[in-house]
Amino acid sequence: LNVPWYGASITCTVHCGWVHGRLCFFIEPHSQDAFFHRGCYYGCDDDPMRFAFFSKAALEFLLRSNKRPDVIHCHDWQTGLIPVMLFEIYKYGGMEYQRVLYSIHNFKHQGFGGTEILQATGLNRPEYYFQYDRLRDNFNPFSINFMKGGINYANHVNTVSPNHAWE
């Protein structure tokens, strides 16, 4: 799988296997950035870029493999750009009927980034995405907010607990 990234591409290997009776696909990028070969899942300075890449790779996999799920279920800020890219890029490539459920696990961590993330993913119009009703963070107008993008672009949003729903 070749994933478009910054005007070039990053090659990934897609592994598949059964987990609890369900066929699952795992995407392994082969990049000099070693996005996910670090010994930790979170807490790296480039987490927004790493998870933006993962989101792009997941959509590229669905597109290239002709898999068209009815619902794409995204979890927390790490996948907040999936609904954005789905409705701004991938619907024009044949993925126009998928619906997105976005689940919020923790409002404390929302995922922030700048124009470099938009450029890397192919969301090439910063002036369009840095709008209040799209990705612009409410407190830092020079930053995009992944969670806000997930909320604004998803068809449905839910939380993992009643307390989060109240917040």
Locate each region found by the language model:
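Catalytic cores of nucleotide-sugar-dependent glycosyltransferases that transfer UDP/GDP/TDP-activated
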Residues: 1-167
